[in-house]
Amino acid sequence: MITTKNRIGYIQRRYDENNVPHFKFIVAKIKRVNIGVKSTKVYTKEFYPLDLEDLESTTEMFDTSKGIIIVQEPFILKDDEEEYFQAVVDRWNEEPPKSIFD
């Protein structure tokens, strides 16, 4: 179960005028969790209200398929993963990653 002690991670991708991607790793503290009849919403200061099912499915993709990192999708951040994702984003900013479709 998710609580306000958990954090949300997000890898943002933007392009400059030369069409070169730049990445930023954002960590957001959970302000509150709203359990409703139809869905459970997670609220942070940085993001719009997030659906818990979407967060859990993205986090499960990270856990089950090692080596694949999804950008522009929020996920539940584990305590030991923050340094890893920051290192990946720093490496991507030095040398942009290739798409899996290349």
Regions found by a protein language model. Give the residues of each.
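A short beta-strand micro-motif
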Residues: 5-13
